[in-house]
């Protein structure tokens, strides 16, 4: 039965969402926590301590930031730079990137960072996207797998100790992320909340897609990540996540909004992609 949150009207078709006895979603409950219960000054102090510990390591890059050029990743980069971190930025290049997305990504790079723009073999990407759409009605599974897998692969290969993600969607918008407390992104988190329908790259190996084809979508083992000393955090754990505020800060630093919304009501979200992101995953 279709239900809607009585506060925000988010439907129960969103994966992992939970409603309380008053039919209020856990995303709204989280909003109350952010406003009343969480000590954000203490969280920011914890981030400063983390930054200090990272700077004491001998890596050339202090952190890796997955970016699209959108308002949120622009804010992530600005925050990292304001703390004196030396980031490497990595982008999974959507096959549908538009001119506005290109401009905003270049604007992010011009903030003063090194950047890798990673394109996956288009023949593989096309096959994989079609398969996920036919099986689940979701063409975005390859996108989410690629964004997360390429990031951890790159951090391990470049010996970068810290990955800085944006918001924890399972905390901000609904999901029972009780064990991780919104702090870190792990393989366990990705499989449950990463919009992959609980699948991993090896689940999609068949006569059309080989293990070699799907290598960019492969998440290294927990042991490989642990041995490399790579930690992946959500910046939204340390700073109060507010899309309107990140939009304001990004706009003050060159980010351009769209002429009209691509999806929903906002012209500053999901505007870098011409068609793929507009096919919503729930």
Task: Give the label of every model feature segment.
Residues 1-63, 79-282:
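Nucleotide-activated chemistry modules centered on ATP-dependent adenylation/adenylyltransferase
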Residues 75-77:
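Long, structured ligand/cofactor-binding scaffold of large enzymes
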